[in-house]
Amino acid sequence: MRFRLVILMASLCLLGQDKKKVPKPPDMEVVTASARRSGDTIHFDGTVRNTSPKPLEKVLILVDAFAPNHKPMVQRKSALEPEYLAPGDEADFHLAMPDTGQLVEFELQAEDGKARELRVARNGPFPIE
């Protein structure tokens, strides 16, 4: 009887471990993103889409710029236009920063008006041309 109980308990423990945690879907998706040099400035432009089922307000796009070997160098923020994004809506961002000559690629992050980090799909890295 004890042996059966031990086998039953071990089986239940093993069955409980098979469940894998399902990752949450992204809140936003990068539709387009580009960076181009112009004189002493790098201009970042792009479009993002709200992929969450909820509206997003006062979203900030964070541009993380990297030197070779993915070495972090600079982070800048830009507000989306418009401020309110219904599910499925798209918004543009535009940002400029001084060109140090070392930056080669960038990635995007986002946060809402309450400084909550948003999950972003297709966020890079993108080349700086």
Regions found by a protein language model. Give the residues of each.
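Hydrophobic h-region of N-terminal signal peptides that target proteins for export
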Residues: I7-Q17
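Asparagine-centered strand-capping/turn motif at beta-strand->loop junctions
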Residues: V48-S52
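Short acidic, flexible loop segments centered on an aromatic residue
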Residues: P53-K71, A110-D112
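Short beta-strand and strand-turn-strand segments in soluble, beta-rich domains
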Residues: P26-D27, K58, P68-A79
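Terminal connector regions
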Residues: H94-E129
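Low-complexity, acidic Ser/Thr/Pro/Gly-rich terminal tails and inter-domain linkers that flank the onset
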Residues: Q17-T47, N123-E129
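Bacterial N-terminal signal peptides that target proteins for export
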Residues: M1-V6
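Intrinsically disordered, low-complexity Pro/Gly/Ser/Thr-rich segments with frequent PxxP/GP/PP motifs
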Residues: M73-Q102
